[in-house]
């Protein structure tokens, strides 16, 4: 018996056409999604990823966004990241990027560049007479647990010296230590855990990179203007109010600046490690920079070379902490 014949040439053409139509219909839902706002390669600016855009429509999580010399890696939805740099000339330098739970981007910038001028400290109010402060919209609701990086330290500073300076700095914030007669009403807590080989999530260009879940204090290279930098990550607090701190890393720029734990009369340009650390600890616990005209507060954007005055808090520094940790 002869085999069954297939469709003729016209039949095959019709069959092929119907198959192509069917596959096209089936593949509609599988086509790759085109980003609503395709982004250029490399670093982005805040104009490339403007406020109101979405990191979901514009695939931006993990990309670096820059503004005025500072930079941040875009965090996952539901997260805020901030960069705060202590600069040699006292100029405020940093910004904040928030990604809402739905992926929407928003920014906050320091209001003005608080440039220190010659004679500024002499003209500014005394620390115990100056009630100015700024807060960053976040706080540590639990205990801030931090690690000391195991990297190279400045000449003449041992690991024990560095740990002691950092612990004293953090304790100055949590206990609101001051010479103004203000009692401690700040319910903030911290604990040093150990030394770690992990690094602060801050690169040599003073940019906050993606967080690793560890709060690390270390030394290394930063942008030439930054004496030290704090990067902080937070998320909305369940009950509202300031955001809940997730991680805060601190790096001291030992590539471009000298540090000491004991400034003496011979000091000309070294920064007191404990003073700088106290300023950075203020950022960790939610304080922002005090502006021009407030040069004698710990949270002014420069700790001033060879000065130990920032080791203790001024009135405004204490009031800022009280406003967060009631």
Summary of predicted features, one role per range:
Residues 162-276:
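Metzincin-family zinc-dependent endopeptidase catalytic domain
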Residues 1-32:
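Secretory targeting and sorting signals
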Residues 276, 280-284:
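Catalytic glutamate of the conserved HExxH
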Residues 31-155, 235-237:
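Disordered inhibitory propeptide/activation segment of secreted metzincin zinc metalloprotease zymogens
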Residues 155-157, 260-263, 285:
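Extracytoplasmic/secreted cell-surface and envelope-processing proteins
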Residues 32-58, 62-69, 79-81, 238-241, ...:
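Metalloprotease/metallohydrolase-associated module, dominated by Zn2+-dependent proteases
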């Amino acid at each position: 018996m002869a085999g069954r014949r297939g469709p003729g040439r016209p039949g095959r053409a019709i069959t092929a056409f119907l198959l192509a139509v069917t596959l096209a219909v089936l593949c509609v839902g599988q086509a790759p999604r085109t980003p609503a706002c395709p982004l250029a390669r490399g670093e982005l600016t805040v104009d490339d990823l403007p406020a109101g855009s979405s990191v979901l429509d514009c695939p931006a999580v993990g990309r670096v966004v820059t503004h005025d010399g500072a930079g941040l890696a875009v965090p996952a939805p539901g997260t805020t990241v901030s960069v705060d740099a202590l600069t040699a000339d006292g100029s405020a330098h940093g910004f904040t990027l928030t990604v809402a739970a739905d992926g929407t981007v928003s920014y906050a910038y320091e209001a003005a560049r608080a440039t220190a001028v010659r004679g500024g400290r002499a003209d500014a109010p005394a620390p115990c007479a100056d009630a100015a402060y700024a807060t960053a919209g976040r706080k540590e609701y639990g205990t801030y647990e931090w690690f000391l990086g195991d990297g190279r330290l400045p000449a003449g500073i041992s690991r024990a010296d560095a740990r002691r300076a950092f612990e004293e700095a953090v304790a100055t914030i949590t206990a609101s230590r001051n010479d103004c007669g203000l009692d401690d009403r700040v319910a903030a807590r911290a604990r040093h855990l150990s030394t770690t080989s992990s690094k602060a999530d801050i690169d040599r260009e003073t940019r906050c990179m993606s967080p690793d879940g560890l709060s690390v204090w270390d030394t290394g290279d930063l942008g030439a203007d930054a004496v030290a930098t704090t990067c902080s990550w937070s998320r909305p607090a369940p009950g509202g109010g300031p955001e809940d701190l997730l991680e805060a890393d601190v790096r001291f720029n030992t590539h471009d600046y000298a540090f000491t734990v004991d400034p003496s009369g011979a000091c000309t340009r070294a920064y007191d490690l404990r003073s700088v650390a106290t300023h950075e600890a203020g950022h960790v616990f939610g304080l922002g920079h005090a502006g021009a005209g407030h040069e004698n507060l710990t949270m002014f954007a420069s700790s001033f070379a060879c000065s130990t005055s920032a080791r203790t808090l001024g009135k405004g520094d204490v009031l800022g902490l009280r406003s967060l940790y009631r």
